[in-house]
């Protein structure tokens, strides 16, 4: 029996590594699909902002603390937007998906952006854009930092 356990362990280790590798590929593919779907709705939100007089500065700004979906300007005010999409009501309200933890990450990332670009004294606000099906909801000053 002991003799059989060693080959079994080796078999499991080898196959588990392959399994982990395959799962990793699947997770990456799902993540890439989610990103590409998210990118479509971020583009729609960006178009919406442009149509409402905003100047788009950047999509998907990344720093060590996280990511900001859209950075725009509304007059002299820098607007840091989080875009959330839901396919329908059964998936939940997209605006409720921006919880306190997410707000803190966005705030820290925005702080990093302002320091990096030398605009620490600029007026800023945090908006959330919810896309539900084909409906866009824009909440200005959704939270404060």
Question: Where does each model-flagged region fall?
Answer:
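Conserved catalytic cores of phosphodiester-cleaving nucleases, focusing on short active-site segments
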Residues: 68-91, 106
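Short acidic/glycine-enriched loop/turn segments that link adjacent beta-strands
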Residues: 63-66
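Acidic-basic catalytic patches of nuclease active cores, encompassing PD-(D/E)XK
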Residues: 7, 11-18, 22-59
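Catalytic cores of nucleic-acid endonucleases
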Residues: 7, 18-27, 85-133
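Protein kinase-like catalytic core scaffold
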Residues: 77-79, 125-127, 137
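Short, low-complexity, polybasic intrinsically disordered segments
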Residues: 131-145
């Amino acid at each position: 029996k002991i003799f059989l356990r060693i080959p079994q362990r080796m078999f499991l280790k080898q196959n588990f590594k392959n399994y982990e590798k395959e799962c990793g590929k699947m997770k990456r593919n799902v993540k890439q699909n989610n990103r590409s779907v998210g990118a479509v709705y971020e583009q729609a939100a960006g178009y919406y902002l442009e149509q409402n007089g905003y100047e788009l500065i950047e999509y998907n700004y990344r720093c060590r603390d996280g990511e900001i979906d859209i950075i725009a300007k509304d007059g002299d005010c820098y607007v840091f937007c989080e875009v959330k999409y839901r396919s329908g009501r059964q998936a939940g309200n997209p605006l409720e998906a921006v919880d306190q933890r997410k707000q803190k990450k966005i705030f820290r990332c925005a702080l990093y952006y302002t320091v990096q670009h030398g605009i620490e004294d600029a007026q800023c606000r945090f908006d959330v854009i919810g896309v539900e099906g084909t409906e866009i909801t824009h909440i200005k000053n959704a939270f404060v930092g």
